[in-house]
Amino acid sequence: MHLLIPAAGSGKRMGAAVNKLLLPLLGQPILAWTLQAADRASSIEWIGILSQPGDWPAIEQILAAMDLSTPVQLLQGGATRQESVYRGVEYLYNLGTVERVLIHDGARCLATPKLFDRCSAALQQVDGLIAGIPVKDTIKVTETGPKGIQIQSTPERSRLWAAQTPQGFRLSLLWQAHREALAQGWQVTDDAALFEKLGWPVYIVEGEESNLKLTTPWDLVLAEQILQQRLELAR
């Protein structure tokens, strides 16, 4: 399975002056933890990192220190996650040999090899899927008015799932979806939303509670605790 990792974001919400994936987490950069999990997944045969050229020297240092068994290629990312994935999908499509692809946020460094393998196996049966977990909290749909944020409705919680990554798709369809998005001016926050706009089915594979997306400094604290616990259990 080919894996694309969007890694071109900034560290603004993390309060960092550099790409947050280069920040240290329990002894190594965040991106290194993500790569380590993907490398240990038996189904992953190639990894493409979508990043800005300015970050390539730092990423190359990370790769040199890790000695991964899976081939890794640096690809230029875009100004947004959507543009980065578009470029990665275009690259793979032009190869003419790739049928399916997984996409995984670089900031989800706690995903396990088992999750990558589970998504890869499920993708052999469907054209689109995402990792996800059932929502535990009651969710409110709101609208901001003159007096503040007002609740408009409460969706039925039993039907709500929190989207994670990896997300996987048949490559030819994902390329078609991204080209349509470019033509129509669609802006989405994940690739599954493009399939939804086109009326194509996307299925859910059970994700992991610990598969956090590191966005704020508090997320770093939680991630360090989770990784520390895993290391202690592995001793």
From Swiss-Prot:
One of its GO terms (molecular function) is 2-C-methyl-D-erythritol 4-phosphate cytidylyltransferase activity. The record marks 157, 213 as: Positions MEP for the nucleophilic attack. It comes from the Bacteria. It catalyses: 2-C-methyl-D-erythritol 4-phosphate + CTP + H(+) = 4-CDP-2-C-methyl-D-erythritol + diphosphate. Disulfide bonds: none annotated. One of its GO terms (biological process) is isopentenyl diphosphate biosynthetic process, methylerythritol 4-phosphate pathway. Catalyzes the formation of 4-diphosphocytidyl-2-C-methyl-D-erythritol from CTP and 2-C-methyl-D-erythritol 4-phosphate (MEP). This is 2-C-methyl-D-erythritol 4-phosphate cytidylyltransferase. It comes from Synechococcus sp. (strain JA-3-3Ab).
